């Protein structure tokens, strides 16, 4: 991780080789950095002492340093000569105490850039420099005051640092874990803290920086698995240069030992390597699970998986969380992909371990997937598990499926490099919206109708950017263009020539509802997926799968839409907020179609009787709470984030117990559903189900049913009787013709939900009713 010191980006602060002296002469260190890692490419820095050159010096590789002596009264001058790739070059000159004498770069100024006089007599006041850090330990809460502290100029990159930093130090405890926090004492009320580690104050490496993860605008930071034997330096300061008194506390959460769990246990052996974000490293993995209701012990044999994997850090912002998320693939001993079924999930080789560091409920991602699946959509299957990496406890993770084209996942046709014409070319494709570049995406020819200056991009997810052919790139871009042309046309609502010709409406309704019920901050701007099968398999663009809900189901201080504490706000209007990636904004146009609105309302009303029923959602949450009642204690000892906002800056005070966290989530959901009950647009008329109650003598049982209904009775009539079943969007699901008289028959529906049946005689409605499939 790179941190800014003054105007210079560095990966660490190194003063190796300095022997502090407070006499006539003292050591200075010149640290040179190259961000690309190939040295300064001809650039150089000359150092003159009393007019005599002692250089020139230049960075080699990613960086290098040199030490030289300066005496009291010496004339010191720096002269920089540029050459190629100057935007990669930076440097810093420090005195014996770590004070920055001069720093510049990237793209340093040229010529004579600094002149000064040597001074080896200045000794820093206590707390004003890493070399003069004040002592503190894990039993301490100390009163600090930075009112008279000038500041080091070492910018840690958060909390709008403008100096005024005061420094503390302590040995890294035997657990390797500390929690550092600030609190109110009636003085400074907005702080920042940065943590640094190293064997001494001449060799500091950044360990993180925090603005206001604590109560109010105070700071809280967890540092885990710090190098034993090192010293931890704490840099505390006021936001934006603020000064005053505050409390600083350091605690040791201890070491978590895992012996048994009600959850699956995942044990990863890195073979002495460090897991990085790319490429995957070869490692070994064991998965142990004795099934629901049984304890699984760390000492049990691996009964789910025992073999090779390739593993890497995954995610964007989440990759920087202390509890890192991982992506991995199961492999055979030779390193080839190995498809296996894990924890009841269909056989595949690509999997994820999602971090719960931003989700104290341990349920947000699972809940969203369960809802989407209950709506009949594919959503990644997920299981909670406890993870050990190299015998070190890492907490509760979400073990799940990576979004991928596969018959058991996103079930669309394969698309090979040789399929470039005809029906072959039409699918399957997976697109996503996320952080894009010119090589991995195409730009829409349209802009959101409510934000005409915004550019919209679609990333090639399958086939991947490095394998998709040019005809395939052109085809899917042209298909999206045809969809948008229809969507933004005058006849957009026409069922023959409008957007429905290109779009699978039900999938877009379901995607909308999952992300609006959860008011997902990311669901319409990034972590957005679409997929399309071949035309011979239907061929319309579908929304989904749903993904990434750790910023959902809560009130977030980012924009009025997500800050609302009364359950209100439309997440699909994310473009109205300051956003890091623009939404395509299609729902703004779709909601101008009264038919779409009516279908949306009918679907919502239907789901409120089953998958979105408040009692059902609460029961699901309670079931997870019961499952992890023991594991959560270990998780929150490892990651003491209860009562802490975390990466998503929450508006409300955070619950301080896990049980209270689940109650908070349930209260949020109830309030959100109340608002949606009153504000989902459209009218659900159920088409032919309106009108006076019809008279008929058919009885139906069981109802509700698990799928099969038995009808019987006597019906008089003059001609053939037509019995039909419709779903809530009034699509015909079943039709049979019956003869008048005594009737008995069975009908089966395979998908859970609400349905309606009608019995007609020559167009005259004899009977109607509702069917519920559990």
Positions of the model-derived regions?
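Internal "kinase-insert"/substrate-recognition segments embedded within catalytic cores
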Residues: 268, 329-335, 346-356, 376-380, ...
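Coil residues (strongly favoring Ser/Thr
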Residues: 66, 75, 138, 146, ...
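Middle-to-C-terminal accessory/interaction subdomains
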Residues: 262-264, 274-275, 281, 315-317, ...
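Conserved oxyanion/phosphate-binding beta-strand-loop segments in alpha/beta enzyme cores
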Residues: 301-357
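Bacterial N-terminal signal peptides
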Residues: 8-17
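Acidic, Ser/Thr/Pro-rich low-complexity intrinsically disordered segments
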Residues: 25-26, 31-51, 57-62, 71-74, ...
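C-terminal outer-membrane/trafficking sorting elements
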Residues: 19, 692-774
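Residue-level detector of functionally pivotal "anchor" positions at catalytic/ligand-binding pockets or at interdomain
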Residues: 121-129, 251-256, 678-701, 716
């Amino acid at each position: 991780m790179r941190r800014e010191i003054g105007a210079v980006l560095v990966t660490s602060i190194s003063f190796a080789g300095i022997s502090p002296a407070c006499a006539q002469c003292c050591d200075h260190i010149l640290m040179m950095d190259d961000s690309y890692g190939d040295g300064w490419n001809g650039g150089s820095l000359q150092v003159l002492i009393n007019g005599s050159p002692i250089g020139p010096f230049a960075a080699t590789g990613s960086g290098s340093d040199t030490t030289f002596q300066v005496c009291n009264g010496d004339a010191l001058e720096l002269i920089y000569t540029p050459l190629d790739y100057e935007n990669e070059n930076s440097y810093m000159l420090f005195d014996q105490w770590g004070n920055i004498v001069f720093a510049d770069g990237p793209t340093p100024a040229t010529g004579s850039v600094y002149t000064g006089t040597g001074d080896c007599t200045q000794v820093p006041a206590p707390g004003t420099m890493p070399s003069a850090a004040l002592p503190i330990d894990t039993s301490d809460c100390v009163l600090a005051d930075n009112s008279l502290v000038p500041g080091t100029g070492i910018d840690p990159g958060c909390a709008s640092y403008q100096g005024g930093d005061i420094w503390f130090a302590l040995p890294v405890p035997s657990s390797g874990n500390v929690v550092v926090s600030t609190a109110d004492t009636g003085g400074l009320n907005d702080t920042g803290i940065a943590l640094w580690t190293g064997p001494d104050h001449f060799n500091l490496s950044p360990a993180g920086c925090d603005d206001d993860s604590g109560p109010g605008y105070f700071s809280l930071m967890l540092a885990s698995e710090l190098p034993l034997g090192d010293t931890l330096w704490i840099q505390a300061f006021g936001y934006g240069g603020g000064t005053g008194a505050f409390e600083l506390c350091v605690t040791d959460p201890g070491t978590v030992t895992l012996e048994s769990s009600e959850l699956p246990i995942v044990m990863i052996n890195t073979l002495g390597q460090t897991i990085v974000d790319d490429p995957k490293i070869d490692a070994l993995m064991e998965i142990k699970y004795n099934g629901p209701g049984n304890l699984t012990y760390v000492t049990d044999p691996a009964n789910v998986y025992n073999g090779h994997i390739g593993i890497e850090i995954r995610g964007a912002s989440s990759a920087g969380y202390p509890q890192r998320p991982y992506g991995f693939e199961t492999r055979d001993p030779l390193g080839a992909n190995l498809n296996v079924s894990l924890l009841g999930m269909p056989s595949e080789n690509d999997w994820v371990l999602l971090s719960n560091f931003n989700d104290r409920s341990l349920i947000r991602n699972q809940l969203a997937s369960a809802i989407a699946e209950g709506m009949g959509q594919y959503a990644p299957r997920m299981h909670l598990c406890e993870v050990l990496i190299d015998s070190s406890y890492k907490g509760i993770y979400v073990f799940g499926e990576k979004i991928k084209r596969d018959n058991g996942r996103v079930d669309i046709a394969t698309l090979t490099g040789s399929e470039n014409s005809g029906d072959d070319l039409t699918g399957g494709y997976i697109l996503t919206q996320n952080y894009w570049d010119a090589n991995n995406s195409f730009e829409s020819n349209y802009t959101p109708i409510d934000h005409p200056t915004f550019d919209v991009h679609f990333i090639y997810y399958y086939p991947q950017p490095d394998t998709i052919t040019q005809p395939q790139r052109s085809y899917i871009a042209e298909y999206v263009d045809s969809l948008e042309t229809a969507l933004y046309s005058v006849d957009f609502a026409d069922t023959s020539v409008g957007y429905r010709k290109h779009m699978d409406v039900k999938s877009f309704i379901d995607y909308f509802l999952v992300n609006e019920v959860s008011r997902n901050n990311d669901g319409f701007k990034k972590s957005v997926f679409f997929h399309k099968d071949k035309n011979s398999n239907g061929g319309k663009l579908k929304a989904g799968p749903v993904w990434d809900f750790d910023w959902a189901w809560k009130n977030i201080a980012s924009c009025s839409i997500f800050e609302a504490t009364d359950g209100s706000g439309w997440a699909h209007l994310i473009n109205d907020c300051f956003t890091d990636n623009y939404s395509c904004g299609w729902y703004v146009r779709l909601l101008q179609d009264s038919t779409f609105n009516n279908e949306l309302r009918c679907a919502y009303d239907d789901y409120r009787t089953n998958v979105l029923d408040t009692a059902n959602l609460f029961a699901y949450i309670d079931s997870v709470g019961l499952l992890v009642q023991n594991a959560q204690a270990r998780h929150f000892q490892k990651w003491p984030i209860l009562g802490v906002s975390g990466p998503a800056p929450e508006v409300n005070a955070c619950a301080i117990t896990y049980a209270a966290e689940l109650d908070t989530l349930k209260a949020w959901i109830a309030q959100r559903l109340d608002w949606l009950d009153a504000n989902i647009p459209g009218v659900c008329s159920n088409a032919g189900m309106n009108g006076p109650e019809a008279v008929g003598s058919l009885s139906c049982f069981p109802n509700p049913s698990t799928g099969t209904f038995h009808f019987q009775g006597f019906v008089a009539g003059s001609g053939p009787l037509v019995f039909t079943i419709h779903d809530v969007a009034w699509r015909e699901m079943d039709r049979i013709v019956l003869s008048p008289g005594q009737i008995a028959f069975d009908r089966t529906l395979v998908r859970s939900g609400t349905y309606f049946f009608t019995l007609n005689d020559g167009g005259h409605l004899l009977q109607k009713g509702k069917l519920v499939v559990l």
